[in-house]
């Protein structure tokens, strides 16, 4: 989980809107809206071998496609990137399928990029969902 956390900047945001086409995380409830401090807490909890939400640990498979550069955000090479995904989670003899789209605000960091913000748009974000304890 640390490697995933290290993809984010020190001011990075991770957002799952609760409504389709939700424009602002401050106007209505979100499924997840984490700043860097909350991301660090999430990763620390997920790394704990006794975390109740992940006993037994989920097995997951991720498929990411249709990756596109949607916009160039600065002369320094910062990017807005979009993609579609499917994530299968299997845990306690139960299988769940999540699907949707992601948008990433990426900023130049050395020879690569870091995630300034990540927005995960679940197709069924406005339906009843059991707790989400895996990272996308």
Where are these regions (language model features)?
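Short acidic-aromatic low-complexity motifs
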Residues: 1-7
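Hydrophobic pocket/interface hotspot
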Residues: 4, 39, 106
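A beta-strand edge to alpha-helix "cap/lid" segment located at domain peripheries
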Residues: 68-136
């Amino acid at each position: 989980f640390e490697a995933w956390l290290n993809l984010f900047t020190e001011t990075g945001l991770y957002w799952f809107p609760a409504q389709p086409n939700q424009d602002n995380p401050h106007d209505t409830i979100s499924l997840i809206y984490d700043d860097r401090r909350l991301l660090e807490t999430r990763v620390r909890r997920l790394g704990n071998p006794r975390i109740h939400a992940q006993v037994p640990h989920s097995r997951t498979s991720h498929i990411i496609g249709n990756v596109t550069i949607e916009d160039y955000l600065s002369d320094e090479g910062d990017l807005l990137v979009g993609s579609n995904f499917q994530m299968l989670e299997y845990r306690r003899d139960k299988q769940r399928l999540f699907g949707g789209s992601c948008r990433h605000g990426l900023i130049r960091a050395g020879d690569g990029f870091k995630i300034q913000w990540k927005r995960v748009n679940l197709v069924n974000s406005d339906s009843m969902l059991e707790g989400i304890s895996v990272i996308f």
